Design a protein with these regions (language model features):
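C-terminal lobe and adjacent flexible extensions of AdoMet/dcAdoMet transferase-like proteins
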Residues: 195-200
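A short glycine-rich, Lys/Arg-flanked "PGG" loop and its adjoining helix->strand segment in the class I
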Residues: 116-128
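Conserved class I S-adenosyl-L-methionine
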Residues: 1-34, 48, 72, 76, ...
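A short acidic, Gly/Pro-enriched loop at the edge of an enzyme's catalytic core
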Residues: 91-103
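A short SAM/SAH-binding and catalytic strip from SAM-dependent methyltransferases
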Residues: 102-114
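C-terminal alpha-helical "lid/dimerization" subdomain adjacent to the S-adenosyl-L-methionine
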Residues: 13-16, 133-188, 192-193
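Class I SAM-dependent methyltransferase SAM/SAH-binding core
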Residues: 40-92
């Protein structure tokens, strides 16, 4: 699995290419977390968001499909006492319906062959009145040289995009699925990151 192979260098590589944007996204997501929240994070990767969230919430379950990525999260969040790490598939979440106040999935929808199924699962486990927060890398409406270079580098190392969103098509994705209460925010970077805040 590509993510097992790149887990140890992922933070260093993304910090060089998009560190400022990633930190900004983490700050924005963290502001949505309340002290009483039970949080599920899908596709936690190396724990960039997890590390910001766990001190703020009541509990957090962080999941990923890559064992190596989970090990990176475990190391990064070694002081957490309210964190559980699970290996899990975002399209087949092993949790009861209405289990979490906040469900977060950062930079994964564009990598999935079935993003709709992932949304269905996140919706299922999120409590009524809760929120799904989904930061996702988006390409510019018109590609620039820097973005093309970044995308080519990802292809070289084996990362395959199953869905390629722009900011406008990202909004269309949620509209097509029938979500009405969605707020969007675009964080500039290379690539930029669109954050969808989906009220349940």
């Amino acid at each position: 699995m590509i993510w097992d192979n790149v887990a140890k260098i992922y933070d260093a590589a993304t910090n060089v290419t998009n560190g400022k944007a990633n930190r900004k996204v983490s700050e924005i997501v963290a502001k949505q977390i309340e002290s009483t929240d039970n949080v599920l994070e899908c596709a936690c990767g190396t724990g960039l968001l997890t590390h910001r969230i766990y001190p703020l919430c009541q509990s957090i379950v962080a999941t990923d499909f890559s064992t190596a990525m989970l090990l990176q999260t475990k190391t990064k969040c070694s002081q957490a006492t309210n964190l559980r790490l699970d290996k899990a598939d975002i399209t087949q979440l092993p949790y009861d319906t209405n289990s979490f106040d906040k469900v977060i999935a950062g930079n994964v929808l564009h990598l999935l062959p079935d993003s709709k199924k992932a949304m269905e699962e996140m919706r299922r486990v999120c409590r009524v009145g809760g929120e799904i927060i989904i930061p996702t890398y988006v390409k510019p409406e018109h590609k620039n040289l820097l973005t093309r270079s970044w995308l080519n580098l990802l292809r070289i190392v084996g990362v395959k995009f199953k869905n390629s969103f722009t900011f406008s098509t990202y909004q269309e994705f949620f509209s097509t699925l029938g979500y009405k209460e969605v707020r969007y925010l675009l964080v500039d970077g290379c690539p930029s990151c669109a954050i969808a805040f989906v009220k349940i």
